[in-house]
Design a protein with these regions (language model features):
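Terminal targeting signals and extreme-terminal segments of soluble enzymes
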Residues: 1-219
């Protein structure tokens, strides 16, 4: 989605993307349809849809902004210097998937407590033969926020994110992206994951995901 938006408005960079997820994306061929639905001097809005097997898996609206040189000084970030220890997502039932496409290092918190910080790095190309842009890497990795900050027994409960709403202050520097995710739950099967996104130089943005919580169905 972000890749398509960058191609349509190459002079701009993503500031915000809002994604609504309709169904899981299968492993296989997918197609992305995108168009500029609003264009202005500094901002443009791109609508995009991901199609697999003839069905829409999710849709997105990406707000693009044109950067300028005549701008006030940037606010100082707080450097993130912790290295972390190797970490694996323990709840994926498949031999291959997101958990094998990334390298992860835990830097704060305990897994499963609902408050965890990790470093993530892509192991694979998002598109064969292409080097992902910084914004594309952010889009690919921050969807993991709900999985980083999970706080339930995954043998008993599932937590599916129904959306992703993200703002990015600036592009990350370096290949490692940090996520500090916290999850809160209501008593009616609804949750909210809030994620601070950072690199070694400090905070670069934040993300929110609405969660649909349900008991694991056993045969």
């Amino acid at each position: 989605m972000v890749r398509a938006a960058e191609a349509l408005v190459p002079e701009a960079r993503p500031l915000r993307w809002t994604v609504d997820l309709a169904r899981p994306v299968p492993i296989g061929r997918v197609d992305v349809r995108a168009e500029v639905v609003r264009s202005g001097r500094r901002t443009s809005l791109v609508a995009a849809e991901l199609i697999a097997d003839g069905r829409s898996c999710f849709s997105a609206r990406i707000l693009m902004v044109v950067p300028v040189a005549d701008a006030p000084p940037a606010t100082a970030g707080v450097p993130e210097t912790r290295e972390g220890v190797p970490f694996q997502f323990p709840f994926f039932p498949w031999p291959e998937g997101f958990h094998t496409a990334v390298e992860a290092r835990r830097i704060a918190g305990e897994p499963g407590c609902g408050d965890l910080a990790v470093w993530l790095r892509l192991r694979v190309a998002l598109v064969d033969g292409e080097v992902a842009t910084p914004s594309q890497r952010v889009a690919a990795l921050t969807d993991a926020g709900s999985g980083v900050g999970w706080g339930l027994d995954t043998q008993v409960w599932t937590f599916l994110n129904a959306d992703l709403d993200q703002h990015i202050l600036r592009a990350p520097r370096g290949e490692w992206l940090g996520l500090h995710a916290r999850t809160r739950r209501a008593a009616d099967g609804v949750g909210l994951a809030r994620t601070e996104v950072f690199d070694a130089d400090g905070v670069i943005g934040d993300a929110q995901q609405g969660l649909v919580l349900a008991r694991v169905v056993t045969a």
